[in-house]
Amino acid sequence: MAKVVYLNGDDTLCLKAAEDITADVITFGLDCSNDYYAEDIRPGKMGMRFKVYNSKGLMGELELSIPGKHNVYNALATVAVCDYANIPFEGIKKAVESFTGAGRRFERLGEFDGITLVDDYAHHPTEIEATLSAAKKT
């Protein structure tokens, strides 16, 4: 099997690091210059909805049960790896859409008096920023 590296093509540091990689590089991100990319990103019932494209065109649409742009990136990475392994998009869709997130990562505990209570153990400034950004958009 060929050596393959998957990286966030929207991240300039990842692209810089890839300059010295001799393996095949497959990119994912929000920009259409990536091998796998998302468009029409919008809030869904509980998380994010978006269309997934690759070099052949529209693969399909995904609806995550978890919010945040960072989770769109995570889903795109999953799609890229699974597609490379020749897993049909419908199988990828079923798996990705059934993922409910890690415990205590933007875990919705319920709604009380019109206020949604969320448990999140984010302990790093980058994680806290992603959590707050996701909360503002849901």
Roles of regions detected by a PLM:
Residues 1-117, 137:
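Acidic, Mg2+-coordinating active-site environments of NTP-dependent enzymes
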Residues 121-138:
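AMP-binding/adenylate-forming catalytic core of the ANL superfamily
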